[in-house]
């Protein structure tokens, strides 16, 4: 069994009609709902990989990025691998347009309750509840914020 640690995952948040919503994507392979996720390439940091994956999958550019202070873990029985993914939280503007690539067939901006109903895996639900508790119900810890002067969002993709 292999431990895979070159993986990232993140929740994208926005406001819609005064309500916080998160972006869910429907996978082309499998047809299930999920958050943005993907592999870290050799020359990237985890946060760079998340921003690249977010842009590749949706063409969304966030205005703020945080470490979620959360590691998402799961076992893939098909490949007999354990995945450990660094978690991120991205904030984007309310009028953000989503343009899907070939990996997804649909998207939705969901409330937490809607997301918990749509996703198939308990680990996803735990991640979303963590994000809501620490990034929606209260202001996120400033220590978790990746400063835009350091990150240079637009230079990543």
Predicted regions and their residues:
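Nudix hydrolase/Nudix homology domain
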Residues: 31-33, 102-157
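Conserved N-terminal beta-strand and adjoining loop/helix that marks the start
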Residues: 1-22
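Conserved Nudix-box catalytic region and its N-terminal flanking loop in Nudix hydrolases
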Residues: 18-60
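Conserved hydrophobic/aromatic beta-strand scaffold that supports enzyme active sites
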Residues: 24, 87-89, 109
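Short loop segments at secondary-structure junctions
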Residues: 14-17, 28, 91-96, 112-113
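Active-site segment of metal-dependent pyrophosphate-handling enzymes
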Residues: 59-96
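Short secondary-structure boundary/capping segments
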Residues: 2, 25, 80, 98-100
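Short connector loops at helix/strand junctions that flank enzyme active sites
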Residues: 5-7, 35, 83-85
């Amino acid at each position: 069994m292999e431990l895979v640690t070159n993986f990232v995952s993140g929740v994208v948040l926005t406001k819609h009609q005064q309500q916080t919503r998160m972006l869910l994507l429907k996978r082309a392979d499998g047809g299930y709902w999920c958050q943005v996720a993907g592999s870290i390439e050799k020359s990237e940091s985890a946060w760079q990989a998340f921003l690249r994956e977010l842009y590749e999958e949706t063409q969304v550019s966030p205005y703020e990025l945080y470490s979620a202070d959360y590691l998402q873990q799961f076992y893939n029985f098909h490949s007999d691998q354990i995945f450990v993914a660094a978690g991120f939280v991205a904030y984007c503007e309310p009028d953000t347009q989503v343009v899907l690539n070939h990996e997804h067939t649909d998207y939705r901006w969901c409330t937490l309750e809607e997301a918990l109903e749509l996703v198939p895996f308990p680990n996803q639900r735990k991640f979303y509840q963590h994000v809501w508790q620490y990034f929606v119900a209260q202001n996120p810890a400033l220590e978790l914020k990746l400063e835009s002067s350091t990150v240079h969002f637009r230079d990543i993709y």
